[in-house]
């Protein structure tokens, strides 16, 4: 039951943050909604931090990993919305925006994950 609660609570907070980002940012660039992009980049960065952190703290309760990674970051990031937005661009014949959107989401998310891992490693090195 604790496992389900951890995932449920984390996912709820992640989804709320994703909704807020969409509400505040999507209208700024309708072709490539910045709320969706921001949610995926932020999620990528935070999962990099989380993966690095949990790899150095193997004795933490598994519920923490489920709360943060499966729940919160699963609720925050959104492959389905990204897919729907890219298919809309394809249907509208906006091929340049489609290519840019795919590159920004996929490349950016992977880059942000690597940056999160690097950030954690850097903080570990300078902190002790």
From Swiss-Prot:
GO biological-process terms attached to the record: cellular detoxification of fluoride
Catalytic reactions on record: fluoride(in) = fluoride(out)
Residue ranges crossing the lipid bilayer per the database entry: 3-23, 34-54, 67-87, 98-118
Classification via Pfam families: CRCB (PF02537)
Entry keyword annotation includes Membrane: yes
InterPro entries per record: FluC
Location of the protein in the cell: Cell inner membrane
Amino-acid positions noted as binding Na(+) in the UniProt annotation, renumbered to this chain: 74, 77
Alphabetical keyword list: Cell inner membrane, Cell membrane, Ion channel, Ion transport, Membrane, Metal-binding, Sodium, Transmembrane, Transmembrane helix, Transport
Family: Belongs to the fluoride channel Fluc/FEX (TC 1.A.43) family.
Job of this protein: Fluoride-specific ion channel. Important for reducing fluoride concentration in the cell, thus reducing its toxicity.
Name used for this protein in its record: Fluoride-specific ion channel FluC
Gene name, Swiss-Prot/TrEMBL: fluC
């Amino acid at each position: 039951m604790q496992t389900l609660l951890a995932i449920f609570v984390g996912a709820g907070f992640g989804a709320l943050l994703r909704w807020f980002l969409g509400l505040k940012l999507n209208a700024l660039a309708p072709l490539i909604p910045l709320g969706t992009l921001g949610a995926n980049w932020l999620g990528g960065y935070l999962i990099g931090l989380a993966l690095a952190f949990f790899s150095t703290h193997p004795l933490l309760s598994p519920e923490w990993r489920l709360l943060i990674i499966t729940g919160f970051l699963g609720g925050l990031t959104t492959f389905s919305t990204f897919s729907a937005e890219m298919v809309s661009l394809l249907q509208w014949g906006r091929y340049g925006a489609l290519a840019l959107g795919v590159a920004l989401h996929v490349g950016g998310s992977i880059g942000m994950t690597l940056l999160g891992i690097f950030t954690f490693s850097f903080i570990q090195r300078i902190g002790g």
